[in-house]
Amino acid sequence: MSEKMYPIPFKSLMNWIVTEYAREGEIFGVHTPYYATGKTLPIFGETIETPFGPAAGPNSQLAQNIIAAYFAGARFFEVKTVQKMDGEELARCVPRPCILAADEGYNQEWSTELEVPQAQNEYIKAWCALKVLSKVYGLGSPDGFVFNMSCLLYTSDA
């Protein structure tokens, strides 16, 4: 994954998906789609078709990565919490690389690589795409996945 993340416009994203699926039978390099079996599990008042999915991280900030995970069978998406300091401002405050593993892992990660409105747009694009793809390609129920996001509350110091 590149150090800099570049969101893809929704129309381009959907055109890429439709073209790749028609030509190769895959989406974003995922060769074998997961087709839901009809079994579901309850979670947070919703249902999911499988009990796994990507953990929050840079990987879950771009719509195409969420879509690829869904196509492979993920149905629980822990989307990354965003905060006031974001994007370039936050990147300047955290030393690089943020993960050092010379002999034991140490992770010093910031909360968001995208700016808050960009991250929001990515989650909305992914959510809409999954609703469509689940139906069009028969991958599962449009209500068979969950986006889980923790809340970050702000208080005024004034």
Regions from the PLM with identified roles:
Residues 75:
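Metallocofactor- and cofactor-centric catalytic cores in central/energy metabolism, strongly enriched
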